[in-house]
């Protein structure tokens, strides 16, 4: 019960207009893992580059084998995986700059007592990460529940499909458990804004006579604008799903912080000496 009460208090504190923004004075958390003790960590640096290069390699392969005269870019799956790639590359570069103190990235933050203002680059990264995380979960859920085996087209690359529709969300969830910077409830609006943008894109694409690579006059069957009622149901459903996932992620973020504090106490020099 105490845990639930603490969650509700934290949730209510999040509902402030300022939390729509990206101001955060503990900027060192954007450069480190939730679980590392020191300011820099070589394992975390390697982790960031392995993640980034994996996403980049898969995305390049997807473009090569699925380009289809540009039809590759009409799908939300490929938007989402592209965002994953960009976000992971930015994170890898930022952690590298912190690790090697490029342009005094780490020194300036340490001199400020870890109270430096959030730079524009970090704000962009935070904004992208929010959209990437929510979009990955939505893509996996919608594909496996509503689209898999129900689309009027053959599955030509099953291995790629598993990576882009399944491993994407698994890897983003793993990364979410690793990173140290916070998740804000009100940042769910950025995932919603991307959903609105994609819905408008599919509508405009339909009105312009656009088709998929097999000649179907829709991007996805559940977004066939010849049946606008179904499209609106899909639209509302996606919004509700984003909200549910974001609240669950906020709870997971709080649990992660709680476990981190517990382990920090257990493995502190004083605690170890008492064992």
Curated annotation (Swiss-Prot):
It is found in: Membrane. Expressed in cells of the somatic mesoderm, most notably the muscle founder cells, between embryonic stages 12 and 14, in growing muscle fibers in dorsal, lateral and ventral positions. At stage 16 strongest expression is in some ventral muscles and muscle 8. At stages 16/17 expression is restricted to some cells of the CNS, the brain and the gonads. GO terms for cellular component: membrane. The keyword Membrane applies. Pfam families: Rost (PF21534). Its main location: membrane. GO terms for biological process: myoblast fusion. Keywords: Developmental protein, Membrane, Muscle protein, Transmembrane, Transmembrane helix. Disruption phenotype: Flies exhibit diminished fusion of embryonic myoblasts to syncytial myotubes. InterPro entries: Rost. The keyword Transmembrane helix applies. It is a multi-pass membrane protein. The chain crosses the membrane at residues 45-65, 72-92, 127-147, 162-182, 185-205, 232-252. May have a central role in the fusion process during myogenesis, within the somatic mesoderm. This is Protein rolling stone. It comes from Drosophila melanogaster. The lineage of its organism: Eukaryota, Metazoa, Ecdysozoa, Arthropoda, Hexapoda.
